[in-house]
Each structure stands twice: as C-alpha cells, then as structure tokens.
C-alpha cells in the first residue's frame, strides 16, 4: 500500500504522462503535486515507486513513465467519475436527433465515444444471451420421421429432423409436444439439460434435438462490431512507428480485433478495465481496453468499449463508457417495451 505522499506523486506522474506523452521529471512532479518537499525527497519517492513496479525509468537520468501497475492504481481511484451534466445533456440531445433504429444508435455511440476519448471505440449489436423456449411442435412427415419445430422467445424458428424408433401418429406427437411445452416453456438449454423429466427413448431424442438447436443459436457469432476513431488512435505518439500502426490495421482487416476486445463477462452494467498485460490476448497487451455491457439481462445484451495505448485518458474513457452504456440500456429497454433504466438526466 502506498503512502499518501507516494500516491500523490504517482498520480502526478500518470496525469502528466497521459497529457504530454514524455517522461515526467522530478522538477515537473514538484511543480504539479503541491507538496511542501524538496527535489531530493521527490527523487527518493520515485526510486521507491520504480522498485515496487509502479513506474519505469528508461534511463535513470531521464524522467518517469507509468507501468501497468501504476496505471491500475490510478484507475482504481477513478471508479466514481462521471461526465459533466452539460455533456450528458448534449449526448442525450444527439440521440434524440437520429432515427430510432439500432444501427443509427450504434453508429452514433462509437462516433461520440471515439471523439471524446480520442481513441478507437467499439460497440456490438445487442443479442439474446441465451435462447428460451417459446413453443415446441412435432410434425409427422412419414412413418418414423418427425420434424421438430422450435420457436424461441423473440420469434426465432429452428427446425430439425429426428428419426423415432417406431412409427408414430400425429396425435401421439401432439401429446409429446404438449408435455414438453408444459415442462420447457421459458427455459434455456442449460435448464432443459438439468431438468429431470423421465422421458422415453424417443422423447430423449427430441430433447437432444432441442438442446442442439438452442446451442447452435447461443453460439452463433454476432455481427461484426461497429468501430470508429482509428484515426484518433493512429495520431497518438505510440503509433508514429509504422510497424505498430500496421499491426493494429492487420488485426482489424483480419477481423481478429473484435474477438479480442469483447471479452465474455457477466452482465452487471459495470465498467471493466484491462490494462496492458491484463488483456487475455498477447496481441493487445500494449493496449488498454475499457468495456461495459448494455441492454437487458438474459434478453438482449451488447458491449461498448474503447481501446487505445496504455497511456489513455482513463478519466474521460471511464465516464464516457459508463454513461453511454446507460443511454444504450435505456434505449434497448424502450425498444423491447421494458421499464426504462434510470436516465440520470
């Protein structure tokens, strides 16, 4: 745990480096932090911060730059940051100006977020997290060949052929359909798999068919995310070397980046921050990722976020991602006829 003085010095280093993108000297820290101490004390504190892994000094005669651990300490102190009221009003106004269509909202979201953070923003289309049974129908085609029709919540229809052991009549299939509808209405595939029902061999085949169709729907890849703001990120000093710019461009062109920056996480409307080495994918461990989910739990959930170098304007990014996820959750709730999220106007 850092002392209060060390924390003030670390925050000064992080803030100045984020703003200026050059190593921070002891004299700059002394001018910025407002502590009544001498330069020698600053230098001693800087050495301790380096030993403990919070900062890096490329050369001992040069200034300090934050390490991932230093950024993490800084970010933890920003958990409750919010957008200014005027900015919230402006964002609401912008959303009221566009058509009430999901693609319009998503395009506006990434445009606003990337402009505010001056980095690349991403948002995914909200999709159902787990399919739920709405209705099951079994149709006799010929002899023992049966068509299993599954209607999911949201009116998605799936169907699959199943061979029964013996010839079965349509009235018998209707009885099985009714039994399964009573048992499985509103359930996810996980709940169906765990629900004991005492099924016979043919009914188990139907159950397996239902689970297979629902798994395919659950695992179906969502549409490619909406991106904006690549030009902001490439203007940062970290990308003045062509190699790094080419690497991020290749990830975008090969459609790898979308999978890397939309990590699976439980829906909680909270903002998650992944700094440098905290990212699961080795290819983005020189970056920071700030993401949040939005939408309606268990019905329609998307992801909104921003990616950029670890030298990111975290305060702006956290507040913008948090507020835009709230705005999008409210819009999705209204679209689905649900109670709106607190608009926090």
From Swiss-Prot:
InterPro entries the record matches: GAF-like_dom_sf (IPR029016), HrcA (IPR002571), HrcA_C (IPR021153), WH-like_DNA-bd_sf (IPR036388), WH_DNA-bd_sf (IPR036390), WHTH_transcript_rep_HrcA_IDD (IPR023120)
Keyword Repressor: yes
Keywords noted in UniProt: Repressor, Stress response, Transcription, Transcription regulation
Pfam families in the record: HrcA
Superkingdom of the organism of origin: Bacteria
Molecular-function GO terms, alphabetical: DNA binding
Example GO biological process: negative regulation of DNA-templated transcription
UniProt cross-references to HAMAP family, sorted A to Z: HrcA (MF_00081)
Function noted in UniProt: Negative regulator of class I heat shock genes (grpE-dnaK-dnaJ and groELS operons). Prevents heat-shock induction of these operons.
Family: Belongs to the HrcA family.
Alphabetized PANTHER family for the sequence: HEAT-INDUCIBLE TRANSCRIPTION REPRESSOR HRCA
Record's protein name: Heat-inducible transcription repressor HrcA
Naturally occurring in which organism (per UniProt): Dehalococcoides mccartyi (strain ATCC BAA-2100 / JCM 16839 / KCTC 5957 / BAV1)
Phylogenetic classification of the source organism: Bacteria, Bacillati, Chloroflexota, Dehalococcoidia, Dehalococcoidales
């Amino acid at each position: 745990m850092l002392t209060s003085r060390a924390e003030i010095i670390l925050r000064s280093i992080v803030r100045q480096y984020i703003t200026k993108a050059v190593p921070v000297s002891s004299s700059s820290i002394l001018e910025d932090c407002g502590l009544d101490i001498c330069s020698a004390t600053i230098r001693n504190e800087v050495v301790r911060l380096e030993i403990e892994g919070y900062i890096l000094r490329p050369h001992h005669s040069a200034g300090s730059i934050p390490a991932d651990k230093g950024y993490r300490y800084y970010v933890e102190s920003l958990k409750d940051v919010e957008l200014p009221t005027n900015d919230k009003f402006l964002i609401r106004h912008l959303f009221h100006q566009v058509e009430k269509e999901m693609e319009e909202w998503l395009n506006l979201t990434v445009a606003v977020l990337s402009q505010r953070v001056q980095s690349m923003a991403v948002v995914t289309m909200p999709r159902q997290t787990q399919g739920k049974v709405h209705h099951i129908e079994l149709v006799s085609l010929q002899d023992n060949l049966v068509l299993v029709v599954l209607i999911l919540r949201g009116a998605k229809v799936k169907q699959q052929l199943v061979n029964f052991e013996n010839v079965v009549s349509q009235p018998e299939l209707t009885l099985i359909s009714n039994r399964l509808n009573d048992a499985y209405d509103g359930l996810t595939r996980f709940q169906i798999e765990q629900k004991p029902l005492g099924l016979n061999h043919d009914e188990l085949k139907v159950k397996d068919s239902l689970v297979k169709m629902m798994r395919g729907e659950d695992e179906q890849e969502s549409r490619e995310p909406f991106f904006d703001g690549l030009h902001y990120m490439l203007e940062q000093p970290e990308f003045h070397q062509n190699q790094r710019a080419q690497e991020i461009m290749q990830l975008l062109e090969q459609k790898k980046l979308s999978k890397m920056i939309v990590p699976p996480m439980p829906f909680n409307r909270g903002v998650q921050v992944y700094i440098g080495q905290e990212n699961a994918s080795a290819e983005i461990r020189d970056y920071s990722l700030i993401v949040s989910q939005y939408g309606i739990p268990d019905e329609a959930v998307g992801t909104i976020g921003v990616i950029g170098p670890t030298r990111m304007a975290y305060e702006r990014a956290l507040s913008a991602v948090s507020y835009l996820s709230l705005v999008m959750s409210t819009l999705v709730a209204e679209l689905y006829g649900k109670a709106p999220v607190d608009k926090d106007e």
